[in-house]
Amino acid sequence: MKTIRKIFTGFSVALLLGGCNLLDVKPNIITEETFYTSSSQAQLALNGVYGVLNSWQLYGCNLILDLNYNSDIVQYMSTTNATMKGASFEIDANSDDVYQTWTWLYKGIRNANAFLENIEGTDFDPEGKMVAQARFLRAYYYFILAQNWINVPLRLKAIDSYSNVKCPATPQLQVMQFAASEMEKCLETITDDLTFAPSDVTKTTVEGILARVYLYMAGEAVEGTTAEQKHEYFGKAADYARMVIESGKHQLNPDYAQVFINMIGDKYDKEYYESMWEADFLGDRSSPDYYGNSRWGELNGLRSSNCGTNFSEMNTNFAYGLFSNTIKLWELYMDDDRTKLEKNLSVVTDKRQQWTLPPYHYNGTGEESWVYPYGGDPSDARKLIAGIDKTPYYTSGAELKDRNSTNKEETYYPGSRYCGKFRREVQYEGRKNFKSIWCGINVPLLRYSDVLLMYAEAMNEYMGTPSEDLYNVILPLRERAGISTEPYSKYASYEKFQQFIRNERARELCFEGLRKFDLLRWGIYVKSMQDLTTRAGTGTWSTSTARNYIILCSRLSEKNNCLPIPSLELAVNTELKQNHLW
């Protein structure tokens, strides 16, 4: 399902989603002379503000995968990569991936500023809905900048020449306060119609992101906040999350896997609207109308790069699969917050684990091996051709179980499984692509389940104590996952409920690019990763991937709580200073 924003053709593809740089085309590409002679041209200009989301530099790879994916539950499986320096903690101020992400965020801001300046005085947006979207996106880009670089230049006018690029940094807290204030102003005129959701921003999208912004501002990662401000921000986060809940416009899809199958197949859920906002991507670049900039699902999918000459026969599209879970995520599913009875019944498995950490990939080695068929029984064994069929995890010589099982077997790679949440299986993607790293899987930016979790967390922090009502907000997530929950009395203290929510966020939202920023706002990003290295390389987590985690964390320090300001930016904007952590 496509909206006008996703059907970029000709000019807009080349301009926004291709390899060219907006500033390389023309210093002031969005002008009154170029656009704004019709409502359709104004819409195209607004597309230019949205289009940055769909770039390789943001949600196609750099921002979400390269620079911010590693955490205590997700790890980069290698230790070095020339094009993934962020994932291997080898970046510095000269790194191109850092520069490109910084630049494209400011492109989005520049496009928004130009749009807001040029739409003024026209009658193409009589209700102010387009202006509200542009203002929200500009605020969102500033929120991302302040999260990643702390103190950043706050530009509210389009740069009309290369002579006025000098601008000092604004403190992080002020940038985030500006972002929150702008988003709040958007609520007055932005549409509450979900017709074009989750591609377009709507009122509940803004409310949900406001909950995220205020929750982040209330945490430990933002410099300069007082205790009184933190308390206020927790309250505002709860208020905005509550508004989404009380709107009645969003529900949990009863099938957890279907939420992501929709994204894989480029389908919008028009029944439940659990996915509230997505970054849309088109495809594998096999044709001009199937041109995309995303490696989402390819870099963080089930590995299928051992293709050989039989790629056309494979039941999956191409994926390098460079990220896996850690042992901590496995144990969060299998042990933490599980009832005693279900811990002893290995057949009772969290459905989120089944979908996210499947016991197979598509990268088998060797010519042929006898295995059980997927979902079949041992009496119907057949030959598996490596790479074409699912390649199960098992220890050499061990009895191979049904490949759809996720029973707790320590020999079944519990801490080194590829991410299955955005798998590129043909049955879900809807087509067999040519052998390409590019794909059209959409990236979730906000889900209703996240709103529920933010509400429960913010209220616990604001009140200093949980309640059974907050506990009941979380229960539907676990009921959908098919697991039982201990009674409220087990989580009735502030500390226990806080940890329960933190664990539940990992189980529900893993591999969606949120965990690092959760750890940052809790003030435990570096510590949580380095503490986990004591487990790596031993016991049930003794794979080479686990040993790589030790190497990655040896490069980790407090400076990795943020990114360095690019050297090229510092050379041009001489009023800007390098981040103090770098």
Language-model-detected regions and their locations in the chain:
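Sec-dependent bacterial lipoprotein signal peptides
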Residues: M1-C20
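Long, intrinsically disordered, low-complexity segments
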Residues: G19-C20, V74-M77, D92-S95, L105-Y106, ...
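An aromatic- and glycine-enriched ligand-binding surface/loop that stacks and positions planar moieties
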Residues: N21-N81, M176, E184-K185, T204-E207, ...
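Conserved, well-structured interaction surfaces
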Residues: S39, Q43-Q57, S78-W149, N164-Q177, ...
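Short coil/turn linking the two alpha-helices of tandem helical-hairpin repeats
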Residues: D123, I144-P153, L194, Y216-T225, ...
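C-terminal substrate/ligand-recognition segments
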Residues: K351-L475
